[in-house]
Structures are given as C-alpha cells and as structure tokens.
C-alpha cells in the first residue's frame, strides 16, 4: 500500500491511521436464564486487534521505512485512538487496541524523531455517524446529557484535531481527546 501510494503521489510525508472496527462483547458473561457462561471469542478479539492495532502498526512501519529509504523529511503519523482507551464495559478488545495505539504514539514518537517523523494521536469520543444516528433515542439523550458541551461530536471536530497534529511541527508523542469534555 505504501509503495503504491508513494509511486502514485510522487512521495509521502503523512499518514493517518484511521481504520477501525468494533466487535463488542463482554469478556465473560453469564446468561441470567440458563446460567451458561459465554466468552468473547478469539475471532472477535483477533478481528479488532488485527484492524485497529496490527494494521496501524504495520502501515506505520512501512510508511516510516519508506521515509527513511527516500530520506524524506519532515513526516508525520496521526493515529486515531479513542477515549475508550480509558476502559469501556463490553469493549475489552477495542479498549486494548486503542490504548496500545495511544501508547505506541509515544513510543514511535521517540523512535522516529531521529528520522524527522513526528507521531501524534487523536482520541474521539462519541461522533455523529450512521451508527450513532441509529441509537435508541433515550440512550442518545442520556449520552448527550453527560457530555459537558451538550452535543455529540461532528466529523469536522475530529478533522480540526487531525489538522492540528499534521500542521503543528512542535506537537509530538501526545494524544488529543476530542470528546466534548466527557472524559475529564
């Protein structure tokens, strides 16, 4: 993918790791009626870790390797983490992947600084998407009531944070929470 993008665009200087999936489920759940114990499947775990963490890691590796090979400077990687990295019930796999991505933001910033590549992350809270548009109205209202700015985020809110990471050459190794103050 990096080779193709480099060839088609005549070079690269930025990467936004924005792929992500959810496969929600409690790690362990006891059925109230039958007493049966259900466990989060390895497939559910692997799917989320594979896309949200492994995919971003391998793409970052290939991007930075290309920057080093071509002696391109400066460069920047933006990781899309999530405020869920602080822990969400029923999202062990998603939380682990997004927390690891935020941790790797710091690690990679330290590793890649010698190559002129900065790394930052943006951690969205709830954002208007087809998924949130389909939420039960009562649940949606309760969520909005808990957000100090009184609304669900918009894609434009995230873009402003991503744009900041891309453009501010003094920003490195940190994660910006864009959640309307929900996690403060």
Predicted regions: what they are:
Residues 9, 151-178, 183:
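C-terminal substrate-recognition "lid" of short-chain dehydrogenase/reductases
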């Amino acid at each position: 993918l990096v080779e193709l993008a480099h060839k088609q665009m005549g070079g690269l200087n930025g990467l936004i790791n924005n792929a992500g999936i959810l496969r929600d489920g409690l790690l362990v759940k006891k059925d109230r009626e039958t007493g049966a114990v259900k466990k989060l499947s390895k497939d559910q775990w692997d799917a989320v870790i594979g896309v949200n963490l492994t995919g971003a890691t391998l793409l970052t590796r290939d991007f930075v390797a290309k920057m080093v090979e071509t002696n391109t400077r400066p460069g920047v990687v933006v990781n899309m983490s999530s405020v869920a990295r602080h822990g969400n019930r029923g999202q062990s796999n998603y939380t682990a992947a997004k927390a690891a991505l935020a941790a790797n933001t710091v690690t990679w910033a330290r590793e890649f600084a010698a190559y002129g590549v900065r790394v930052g992350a943006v951690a969205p809270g709830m954002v208007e998407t087809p998924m949130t548009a389909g939420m039960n109205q009562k649940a949606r209202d309760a969520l909005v009531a808990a957000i100090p700015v009184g609304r669900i985020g918009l894609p434009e809110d995230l873009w402003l944070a991503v744009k900041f990471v891309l453009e501010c050459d003094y920003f490195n190794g940190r994660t910006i929470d864009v959640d309307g103050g929900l996690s403060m």
